[in-house]
């Protein structure tokens, strides 16, 4: 018995037979049954058979297995010997012959279960093959079939082998083969698998090796495949859904230009491939959740008036979940965050600590009063009135603290918003030179002042000198350097406090002198304009609370006022270099940009190539730099790891090897050690300036040597 899917083997020998059934002879010949002429069965006459062929037919009649393999037959042999019927044949092997079509005689063997037509010249399969309703194994490999007929899909096949043909596609009716367990269509010209292949619910083994497939249909996931071979095709991506093929044990995928999973994963086997696909699936499912807003992130683009209405500082709140903000930030807010979350949280904590410091002594004043009054014999009604006053004072203090916390929160938001606007101004510096000059002056004024001796008179003078304009114009130029450092209210009480602060610090300028410097603008307008805030006419501080606060902190007047204007923590100013300015930073960035462009021009001019727009990514693998070293001096880098079509991206180990070889070549060529960059400057794409210095030194050294030789 022939083994399906492998090279055909001869059937077991059977008894001899001398003739076929007469009705088979009548189907193809219109001659008399009693004629006897010499020759083979291909002349149209009943010619005598050779002894070996007679023996094979005789064995088939008795055993049910017909073996006519490797006999150079061009058609099925015919004989007129009566009394022998081959219609009960179960197995037929006609492999390694010269048949050009499936013999019609075989289509009459209704009991046929296994048919092997391997290695013939078959181009046509007759529709009469549908008569073989017992056929379960069919081998049509190594023939010249250009298509499988639809009638073939009406058979109860379990094994179908059609490899090494010229098939361009599979019929859509292939989904009718419900009992098919093995399908081999390897070494053909198939460009796509039909969607109906997902209906083969019994398929265990699928071989589409050496075809022209570019896409694997996701319907394959529905199949209970144990072995899947799609090697030597043009597949670029393995669908993520393939991770659900739980019964798959053997996966063959070599010689494909796979991009996902990458070749490094594919070479490790099925387990790593499926793990990669699972990770990809998780990333796809959670891609939307990565942009979900978190309640801890502050608003950046919310209008100031809106934030005043619904912001919650967290002080006196019953629900801790409502801290920092009453509404969840939008996606735009989370994307445009510029400040680290740790700074925001620390600043909020500082605000709460300040509020607690103010609240604690005030509560201490109110709490002893009921006990003292109770001891002096005051009536219950008077006691309730006094308690009501105490509650009113306490609630007023809470509202005042809450208002101040809201103002601080607004400053934090506006500061980040102003920082974002400043970056936009810097990016469009050519069109807004006036704005940038003003920003630089403000930043210098902030950073060059003494961190430990920060006082309000310096701030007021710098603001009044730098903003000699009305509040409408000043609001158009938000400056982040002042945010979080001062916010002076327009109420009469606050103006009195400002005057006191200027006098207590020993300032040489009185409020009147300051107003003379800018007669058209009030100090309040100048101060609030940089923040873009409108004066709050309704903000007030209770007299009792204000008096208690002044009495408690009169020795520490500057510190109290600094809390009122919500200065940023001193740690930020202490960590800033006083010699640093925005102007110097911009000059440094301009120089670095020129060095990077010079690096690009040097490489492109030497190697006659056009580098990618992202220069860091183009140099990261070290290939271009090694070629540059070899261009300067041939064979200075002995071996270079280069990407291939199968592996378009080098591993990090190979990239590091290339970079180290380049740096070693630079040392040998005479580049000074202090001008050599480090490997991570190239590998991490974070030191293009240092890489440019190294490349320029390499070119200069070679030019110098060329002049002296």
Curated annotation (Swiss-Prot):
Superkingdom to which the source organism belongs:
Eukaryota
The record's Gene Ontology biological-process terms are: cellular response to chemokine; negative regulation of GTPase activity; negative regulation of T cell migration
**Basic residues biased stretches:** 24-37
Its recorded name reads Leucine-rich repeat and calponin homology domain-containing protein 1
Subcellular location(s) of the protein: Cytoplasm
| Biological role stated in the UniProt entry | Acts as a negative regulator of GTPase CDC42 by sequestering CDC42-guanine exchange factor DOCK8. Probably by preventing CDC42 activation, negatively regulates CD4(+) T-cell migration in response to chemokine stimulation.
**Sites bearing Phosphothreonine, chain numbering:** 581
The protein's organism comes out as: Mus musculus (Mouse)
């Amino acid at each position: 018995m022939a083994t399906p899917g492998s090279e055909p083997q001869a059937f077991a020998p059977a008894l001899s037979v001398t003739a076929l059934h007469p009705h088979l002879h009548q189907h193809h010949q219109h001659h008399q049954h009693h004629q006897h002429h010499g020759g083979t069965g291909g002349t149209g006459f009943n010619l005598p058979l050779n002894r070996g062929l007679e023996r094979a037919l005789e064995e088939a009649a008795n055993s049910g297995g017909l073996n006519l393999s490797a006999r150079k037959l061009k058609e099925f042999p015919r004989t007129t010997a009566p009394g022998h019927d081959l219609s009960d044949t179960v197995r037929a092997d006609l492999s390694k012959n010269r048949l050009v079509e499936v013999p019609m005689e075989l289509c009459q063997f209704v009991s046929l279960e296994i048919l092997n037509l391997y290695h013939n010249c078959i181009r046509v399969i007759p529709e009469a093959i549908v008569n073989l309703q017992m056929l379960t194994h069919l081998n049509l490999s190594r023939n010249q079939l250009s298509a499988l007929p639809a009638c073939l899909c009406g058979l109860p096949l379990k094994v179908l082998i059609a490899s090494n043909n010229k098939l361009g596609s599979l019929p859509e009716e292939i989904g009718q083969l419900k009992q098919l367990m093995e399908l081999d269509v390897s070494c053909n010209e198939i460009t796509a698998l039909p969607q109906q292949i997902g209906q083969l619910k019994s398929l265990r083994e699928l071989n589409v090796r050496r075809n022209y497939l570019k896409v694997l249909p996701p319907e394959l996931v529905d199949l209970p495949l144990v072995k899947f071979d799609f090697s030597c095709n043009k597949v670029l991506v393995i669908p993520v859904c393939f991770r659900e093929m739980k019964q798959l044990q053997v996966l063959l995928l070599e010689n494909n230009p796979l991009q996902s999973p990458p070749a490094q994963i594919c070479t490790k086997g099925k387990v790593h491939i499926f793990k990669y696909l699972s990770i990809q699936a998780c990333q796809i499912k959670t891609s939307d959740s990565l942009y979900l807003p978190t309640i801890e992130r502050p608003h950046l683009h919310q209008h100031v008036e809106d934030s005043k209405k619904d912001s919650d500082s967290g002080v006196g709140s019953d629900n801790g979940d409502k801290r920092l903000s009453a509404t969840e930030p939008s996606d735009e807010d989370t994307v445009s965050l510029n400040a680290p979350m740790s700074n925001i949280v620390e600043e909020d904590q500082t605000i709460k600590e300040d509020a607690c410091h103010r609240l604690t002594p005030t509560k201490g004043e109110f709490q002893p009063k009921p006990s003292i009054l109770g001891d002096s014999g005051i009536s219950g009604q008077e006691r309730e009135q006094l308690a009501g006053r105490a509650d009113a004072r306490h609630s007023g203090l809470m509202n005042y603290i809450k208002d101040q916390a809201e103002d601080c929160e607004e400053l934090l938001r506006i500061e980040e918003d102003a920082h974002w606007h400043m970056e936009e101004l810097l990016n469009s510096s050519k069109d807004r030179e006036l704005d940038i000059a003003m920003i630089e002056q403000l930043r210098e004024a902030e950073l060059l002042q003494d961190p430990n001796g920060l006082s309000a008179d310096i701030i007021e003078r710098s603001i009044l000198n730098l903003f000699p304009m009305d509040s409408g114009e000043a609001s158009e130029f938000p400056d982040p350097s002042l945010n979080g450092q001062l916010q002076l209210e327009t109420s009469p009480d606050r103006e009195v406090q400002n005057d006191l602060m200027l006098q207590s610090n020993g300032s040489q300028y009185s409020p009147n002198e300051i107003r003379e410097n800018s007669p058209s603008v009030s100090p309040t307008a100048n101060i609030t304009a940089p923040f873009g805030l409108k004066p709050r006419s309704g903000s007030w501080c209770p007299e009792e609370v204000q008096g208690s606060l002044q009495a408690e902190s009169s020795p520490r007047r500057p510190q109290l006022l600094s809390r009122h204007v919500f200065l940023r923590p001193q740690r930020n100013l202490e960590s800033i270099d006083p010699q640093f300015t925005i102007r110097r930073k911009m000059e440094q960035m301009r120089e670095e940009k020129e060095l990077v462009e010079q690096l690009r021009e040097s490489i492109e001019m030497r190697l006659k190539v056009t580098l990618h727009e992202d220069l860091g990514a183009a140099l990261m693998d070290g290939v271009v730099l090694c070629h540059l070293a070899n261009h300067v001096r041939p064979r200075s880098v002995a071996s270079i790891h280069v990407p291939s079509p199968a592996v378009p991206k080098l591993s990090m180990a190979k990239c590091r090897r290339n970079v180290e070889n380049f740096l070693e070549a630079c040392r040998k060529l005479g580049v000074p050690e202090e001008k050599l960059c480090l490997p991570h400057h190239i590998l991490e794409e974070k030191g293009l300036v240092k890489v440019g210095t190294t490349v320029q030194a390499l070119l200069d050294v070679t030019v110098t040597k060329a002049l002296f030789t």
